[in-house]
């Protein structure tokens, strides 16, 4: 019965948990470890959708047989500058280099998602254009030291207070940049959870 259907978010990201909670659909979370290396043969859009699917599949394989009818949501976000995905920084210097490159210009943020249920997959992605104004080396250093954006694609969190002074434009879904395109995900989940819609 649809009222007993379980939604599982294939992520421990606090940002994705907060965003999915906005839909009003009850859910659980499951941690997942997969190789998130981009396939150079695929486009950035294809990569975020494929990694999202791999995350959802990994969770689906790990759940018990009585939970096999669960709906599993996987998601992946990347920052793309001049056609090149930036991913998450490995250390301070990498984060500094990324932010130095992003400041003073616009870039794309892509978030892919995959919903698995009853052997079927719904995959999609959202694109948002973000413009970050000029930042001095001192401002970049302070941001990294205070916010520690090492778990964030592109080395920044758009919701971070210290970045607010530098975001000069957003074209597209703000929540997509945070980590989940809430309206697109809700539209895809709504038919599976009609009692919650």
Swiss-Prot record:
Active site: 76 (proton acceptor)
Entry's localization field: Cytoplasm
Enzyme superclass (EC): hydrolase
Major localization listed first in the record, in broad terms: cytoplasm
InterPro entries found in the cross-reference section: ITPase-like_fam, Maf-like
GO MF, one example: dTTP diphosphatase activity
Site-annotated residues for Important for substrate specificity: 15, 77, 159
Enzyme Commission identifier(s): 3.6.1.9
Physiological role: Nucleoside triphosphate pyrophosphatase that hydrolyzes dTTP and UTP. May have a dual role in cell division arrest and in preventing the incorporation of modified nucleotides into cellular nucleic acids.
Family of the protein in this entry: Belongs to the Maf family. YhdE subfamily.
Protein name (Swiss-Prot/TrEMBL): dTTP/UTP pyrophosphatase
Organism: Chlorobaculum tepidum (strain ATCC 49652 / DSM 12025 / NBRC 103806 / TLS) (Chlorobium tepidum)
Gene from which this protein is expressed: maf
